[in-house]
Amino acid sequence: MKNNVIQYKYKEKQEVNKMPKFDFNELFKNFNHEQLTEIYLGYETNLDYSIYSKPEYNHEKMQQIRFGLYKKLDVSWYANSEFGLGQMKQIKKGLESNVDVSWYAKIEFSEFQMEEIRLGLQKNLNVSLYANSKFTWKQMQFIRYCLEQKSDVTLYAKPDFDVSQMKQIKLGLNKGLDVTPYLNPSINWEEMERIRKELETKK
């Protein structure tokens, strides 16, 4: 059994050694088995594996780049070791959907923020209203939902308002109220709700 494993490893090294652009000894010194597998799969499918054959990419990141190359995507948008795996996936999904990933292919956005921007782009929403890293992904999500409902979000699409406050402002606007009395991020959502209900009784 041990001999079979050794023979397999040796054969595997021989196969990888046929690959250009690499020094044999350096290749096996810098990459682990999973990374080598991704490099070899790129070689086997005639992809430019040199794009992701860098020790700073773990095998999962290499895989995302390899998948992108296979689909003929512009992987330069996410072939950056500073991106986390989830961020890479969101950028790749955007490229697959043919949206303008320049809106969110930025290190400062978390994968969840990227997802909210991507989903907005896929629905042709005005993502400029929330494509700001100062928003949490939950704030982005709420603004996106409101935009899908054709709501005017300009009064509350601000990082200073949390989601609960945004909801109270939206509820007031839906009722045709002048929300100015509680349009202030220093007023907590419970107080906003009290003011809103009071305004409703006076309407």
Q: Where does each model-flagged region fall?
A:
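General marker for long, soluble alpha-helical cores
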Residues: 2-203
